[in-house]
Amino acid sequence: HGYRGTTLDQIAETSGLSKPNILYYFSGKEDIHVSLLNQLMESWLDPLERLKPDGNPLEEILAYVHRKLEMTREFPRESRLFANEILQGAPRMAPHLAAGLKPLFDDKTALIQHWVDAGDIATVDPRHLIFSIWSTTQHYADFEAQVGVLMAGEDGVLDGASAYLDNMFRKLLTP
């Protein structure tokens, strides 16, 4: 039904809770939606948080790519829900993006820049590298209908994507 088409009564029925019980914890449907989006953002940030400064830079970045692709495999609906919020201009999430995503993004781009400066990986703009990883992994979830039509009948689409992205980013990042 989507956000607009879903009522608190439907949420209560689906969750197995009474409407008054839900309203005890949440002020309304908007509050539930923002809470869900925040939980999704925390889940999506976990793979980025796991980039280790003391690991092999190329392998750390490739492992991040694979973790993002695995999230695409496991949580395609959640990816689309979060993407829809961003596509709408992040009306509910802008403060949370600034407080949660921005500091982590700045920290990890500084780490990647350190690896670039040390000559551990090729010269890249760390911000655009992260954007590229997001777009090339989440595409398979966010545009699942398109991928399904264009690769109809093929098994292992995400396995093929994993091998392709590994090769692409390895070539890009090898000094």
Locate the predicted segments by residue.
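Helix-turn-helix
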Residues: 1-31, 35
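C-terminal peripheral helix-coil segments that are non-catalytic and often amphipathic
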Residues: 70, 74, 106-122, 136-175
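Short alpha-helical scaffolding segments that buttress acidic/His motifs in well-ordered protein cores
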Residues: 65-68, 82-85, 133, 137, ...
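Amphipathic alpha-helical segments used for helix-helix packing
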Residues: 73-95, 143-149
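Short coil/turn segments at alpha/beta junctions that flank glycine-rich nucleotide-binding fingerprints
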Residues: 1-4, 54, 75, 118
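Hydrophobic alpha-helical connector segments
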Residues: 49-78, 126-133, 162
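Alpha-helical structural segments
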Residues: 14, 31-51, 59, 63-70, ...
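All-alpha amphipathic helical-bundle segments outside canonical DNA-binding/catalytic cores
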Residues: 59, 95-99, 116-132, 160
